[in-house]
Swiss-Prot record:
GO terms under cellular component: cytosol
Taxonomy of the source species: Bacteria, Pseudomonadati, Pseudomonadota, Alphaproteobacteria, Rickettsiales
Keywords of this entry: RNA-binding, Transcription, Transcription antitermination, Transcription regulation
Record-linked Gene3D superfamilies: NusB-like
Listed CDD domains: Terminator_NusB
Function recorded in the entry: Involved in transcription antitermination. Required for transcription of ribosomal RNA (rRNA) genes. Binds specifically to the boxA antiterminator sequence of the ribosomal RNA (rrn) operons.
Pfam families found in the cross-reference section: NusB
Similarity comment: Belongs to the NusB family.
Entry-linked NCBIfam families: nusB (TIGR01951)
Keyword Transcription regulation: yes
Stated name of the protein: Transcription antitermination protein NusB
InterPro entries cross-referenced by the UniProt entry: NusB-like_sf, NusB_fam, NusB_RsmB_TIM44
Gene Ontology MF terms in the entry: RNA binding
Gene Ontology process terms (BP): DNA-templated transcription termination; transcription antitermination
């Protein structure tokens, strides 16, 4: 019987969301420190206790680092895009931290990673949102990513 594997880029996306969440929560702008903390967690599979025995977890380190660095480099533009997609009755300061982290990473990949098709980015982050956010937030993520994909051409 072969062992199960989850796509390395999918794990990198989850790890990037966790890194950006940590950045926001701890108000820590030391990108290298944040990346090292998250990478050490994933490199020590013993840290992940609720996995099926035959499931192997590894991440694309290059994709993870590219996502985190791109978010740090473009954070003001990403937040402006996110805030512009909020309805008038929503205060950006009250957006849940995990939702903002997921949107920062997903929008960053959508706009600054031209090798990944927009449909893949939208599907991947909607799946991640499904595991991390409530139903309303999942719909919001899907809607925002879909709108951005239609509004923006890829930046190179």
């Amino acid at each position: 019987m072969s062992s199960n594997k989850i796509n390395k880029k999918s794990i990198a996306r989850i790890a990037a969301v966790q890194a950006i969440y940590q950045n926001i929560l701890q108000n820590n702008d030391d990108m290298d420190d944040i990346m090292q903390n998250v990478l050490s967690f994933y490199q020590n599979n013993n840290s992940i206790t609720d996995l099926p025995e035959n499931l192997k977890i590894s991440l694309s380190i290059s994709h993870f680092k590219m996502l985190v660095k791109s978010v740090f480099e473009n954070i003001n533009k990403l937040d402006e895009i996110i805030d512009n997609h909020l309805t008038n009755d929503k205060d950006p300061a009250h957006m849940p931290i995990l939702l903002r982290a997921l949107l920062r990473v997903s929008i960053c990949e959508l706009l600054f990673c031209p090798t990944t098709p927009a449909k893949v980015v939208i599907n991947e982050y909607t799946d991640i949102a499904n595991d991390m956010l409530n139903e309303h937030e999942i719909g919001f993520v899907n809607s925002v990513l879909d709108k951005i994909a239609k509004e923006h051409t890829r930046l190179i």
